[in-house]
From Swiss-Prot:
Heterodimer with B2M (beta-2-microglobulin). The association with B2M appears to be facilitated by the presence of the propeptide. Residues 1-19 form the signal peptide. SUPFAM superfamilies: Immunoglobulin, MHC antigen-recognition domain. Keywords: Adaptive immunity, Disulfide bond, Endosome, Glycoprotein, Golgi apparatus, Immunity, Immunoglobulin domain, Lipid-binding, Lysosome, Membrane, Signal, Transmembrane, Transmembrane helix, Ubl conjugation. Mono-ubiquitinated. Proteolytically cleaved in late endosomes to yield a soluble form. Disulfide bonds join C230-C285. One of its GO terms (molecular function) is endogenous lipid antigen binding. This is T-cell surface glycoprotein CD1e, membrane-associated. Residues 20-31 form a propeptide.
Amino acid sequence: MLLLFLLFEGLCCPGENTAAPQALQSYHLAAEEQLSFRMLQTSSFANHSWAHSEGSGWLGDLQTHGWDTVLGTIRFLKPWSHGNFSKQELKNLQSLFQLYFHSFIQIVQASAGQFQLEYPFEIQILAGCRMNAPQIFLNMAYQGSDFLSFQGISWEPSPGAGIRAQNICKVLNRYLDIKEILQSLLGHTCPRFLAGLMEAGESELKRKVKPEAWLSCGPSPGPGRLQLVCHVSGFYPKPVWVMWMRGEQEQRGTQRGDVLPNADETWYLRATLDVAAGEAAGLSCRVKHSSLGGHDLIIHWGGYSIFLILICLTVIVTLVILVVVDSRLKKQSSNKNILSPHTPSPVFLMGANTQDTKNSRHQFCLAQVSWIKNRVLKKWKTRLNQLW
């Protein structure tokens, strides 16, 4: 524990540059949610001799840091992920986490029998701080369920976690040095690091990307019923409001899925509504997002059918053109295939050769037209399937 305190002395008391940047006093978040910095740890224990831990750091919903389990080093995922910390401060922080991950696995494996932790099991820890808020947070989950938390001055078992969580909290509450370390790390170092990140990444945090939305039919929930699906994608920041509407009336049956990340660091969400087939008319999907400047995005159910009609008309026109071209080629070929009934002459022989050449050319054209038709049909069929 002495080593932890020495590391923290350098981390929490670096001398100069300990105040949060003044420029942040006027900083306003693009999202409605209060911004936080969160550290997430996932440790898997297969047996008493094998365990694996992963760690990551998140500024709001944006991952800014990772933990290299092989090298035991912090991975900075953004050019500004260093914040305003000095190299020495980051080195101290990295040394602290190296010691923590190594010690955590040893302590858990040594205590698994005492607290009846049955292999294999998984422990998740979420800890961090919020900007301009005094409270800190640390929550632990065991096998995917809430287990215990650190409330700033004491460890508390989660409701329904049972006697095992109560016993572990009793043991943890005896170690005052652990409480002091957490209070310093989460109550002092974390807010200062969060302030530096917000200043360094201000331009990216203020980025706004407008959502795109489209409608489709999902799997039928039953005879005579429809599942209407509203897809919203490509928006940033994450907070978004999506609802099926009838006029100005919200449809309470709207089911929202999870907000999922896209590869370009934007977000995707779908909202569904099960209705009787005859009640779909007049419904619309409304999207509210900070990038829209107060103007809601509204898509009416059935509006997309006009688009489908245009596609169908385009397909029909294309097929008609192909049929006309095919017909003309056949007509030209038949006009030039009239043979003379007289004895063959050199001119006829020459014409025969020409005819063979033209027949070959005609067959090639027919094959090409057939290939074009098949290809076009295949493409349009694929597009239509995607819409449905």
